[in-house]
Structures are given as structure tokens and as C-alpha cells.
A protein has these predicted regions:
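Nucleotide-sugar donor-binding catalytic core of glycosyltransferases
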Residues: 2-251
Length: 251
């Protein structure tokens, strides 16, 4: 539940430009008795978006979202499960509107990372086709996409290099962001600045971690800690890239 609300806050915060997650730096400074955080750890959203922001959630055919999860429930606990939980939380969110005419923002639930191999690795090779197909449908059935080619639309694209949809950096960069998504807002875990797979205005979010795993790590607040916060950084894929090239980067 907690993780879900964090993601919703991240999404809502973007519309008010109140939160800039990507590139945030947290410096942990040690002193004799206490640890202090300085730097820009991300601004806090102070305004309550309820009543000010309305999000319309497209009702897409199940093949774009719930069907793949039924087929492979491992998608629910995978690090890319954000695409599922953002969708679920928006469905019952106070910012949701059922009337697209009054919407400020449109969300299309397309789960592009739920095609897992036997060993649980997501295969993004079908993602571009799936995304293009969903957008074609949205553009045909509703008038809102064509007004601005999706400027007021957002998508969750949590795969390694976001909407570049490839797990190897060179190939992801050569592909670039899927053209049909270039005007929309992308919510993604990939957050490296000045990278072709991160466009301006994207929202960087943490990968999904199942609540029971998070809860298992909870420490009593008074516990002395030498590490205050830890961000997972580079990923290496020794199997596919024995030379040690980058596989993907954490947010
Ligand atoms: C939006 O544009 C596409 C491509 O030109 C077209 O096929 C579609 O019918 C348009 N949608 C609407 C609702 O007019």
C-alpha cells in the first residue's frame, strides 16, 4: 500500500512540477552523533492534488494489461510491476475522473514488461508493437490523443531503458524512444540525464519492491545506522555481455 501511494504521489507531483526525481542527489554527512541529509533529495509535494487534478484512465482491452498478468502472475512481484500498481491505484484514486471531457491528464494502462522468459526476464521485443497498437486504438476511439499527439497523456514504461525498449544500452540508444511516445509523459525507472532514453519531462520512479520484502527490512526508527539510504546503481549482465558493458542503470 505504501509503495502504491508513493507512485501516485510521483505521478501527481509531476503535473505541478513540484517534484523532480531524476538526478536527485542525496548527500549523507556524518557528524559525531547524528547523520544529516543535505542536497536536493527531491522537493516535497505540499499541495494536495485532489480536487485540482483529474486523470482519465482509458479502459483498454484486457490484452494490453490484465491478460498478460493472468498468464504470468510473476509480473505482480517483478521489479517492473509498477506498471500494474500505478494502474490499480489510479482506478480507485480520488483524482480519477470517469468523464474524459473534464480530464487534465490521460493515462493509458499498457503493460509492456509482462512478457517474461522461463527464468523471469522480461522480453521487450513485442513492447513497441503493443504500445503502437494501444495508441492507435486510443486515437481512433477517443478524440483526445489526436488533439496534441498525446501531450496530455502519460504511460508507465518501467523497462531498463524506458521506452527505448531494449535491455542493451547500445541497442536501446540506437532505437531511441518509441516515436509515437515522444510527446507524452513517460513514468520510468531509468533516470540518467542527458541520455537519449530519458526525455525532458519524464518522471523517474523507483523499481517495484513487494511490500512484504520492504516490511521485512524495516528497522525500528532509533536503530543507529551507518548507511542512511542506498540507491542501486549499475546493472551488469555478465551472461549476455561478458565484457562487462552496461546493462542498465538504476534510477
Ligand atoms: C486520429 O487520427 C488518426 C490518424 O490520422 C485517424 O485514423 C483517427 O480516425 C483519428 N481519430 C479520430 C477520433 O478522429
Amino acid at each position: 500500500m505504501k509503495m502504491r501511494s508513493i507512485f501516485v504521489i510521483a505521478i501527481l507531483a509531476a503535473t505541478t512540477a513540484a517534484v523532480l526525481f531524476h538526478g536527485s542527489v542525496v548527500d549523507v554527512q556524518q557528524s559525531h552523533h547524528t547523520e544529516r541529509i543535505s542536497g536536493t533529495g527531491g522537493d516535497v509535494l505540499e499541495e494536495d492534488p485532489v480536487g485540482k487534478l483529474k486523470v482519465y484512465v482509458y479502459d483498454l482491452p484486457a490484452k494490453y494489461n490484465t491478460k498478460p498478468v493472468e498468464k504470468d502472475p510473476r509480473c505482480l512481484t517483478h521489479m517492473f510491476a509498477t506498471e500494474i500498481f500505478v494502474h490499480r491505484s489510479l482506478l480507485s484514486s480520488a483524482v480519477r475522473t470517469l468523464d474524459p471531457e473534464e480530464a487534465d491528464w490521460f493515462y493509458a494502462p499498457v503493460y509492456t514488461t509482462c512478457d517474461l522468459t522461463a527464468s523471469g526476464h522480461p522480453m521487450p521485443f513485442d513492447s513497441p508493437r503493443m504500445m503502437r497498437s494501444a495508441i492507435r486504438l486510443i486515437a481512433e476511439r477517443w478524440p483526445y490523443w489526436n488533439r496534441s499527439e498525446g501531450v496530455d497523456h502519460f504511460f508507465v514504461t518501467p523497462h531498463d531503458f524506458g521506452a527505448c525498449f531494449h535491455f542493451q544500452e547500445e541497442k536501446a540508444m540506437a532505437r531511441g524512444i518509441l516515436p509515437v511516445l515522444r510527446r507524452a509523459t513517460l513514468v520510468q525507472t531509468f533516470g540518467q540525464r542527458n541520455h537519449v532514453c530519458l526525455k525532458d519531462g519524464s518522471i523517474t520512479i523507483p523499481p517495484y519492491a513487494p511490500p512484504w520484502k520492504m516490511e521485512a527490512q524495516l528497522l525500528p526508527p532509533a536503530t543507529p545506522r551507518s548507511i542512511f539510504v542506498y540507491f542501486r546503481g549499475l546493472f551488469y549482465d555478465a551472461g549476455n555481455d561478458p565484457e562487462g558493458g552496461y546493462y542498465a542503470r538504476g534510477a
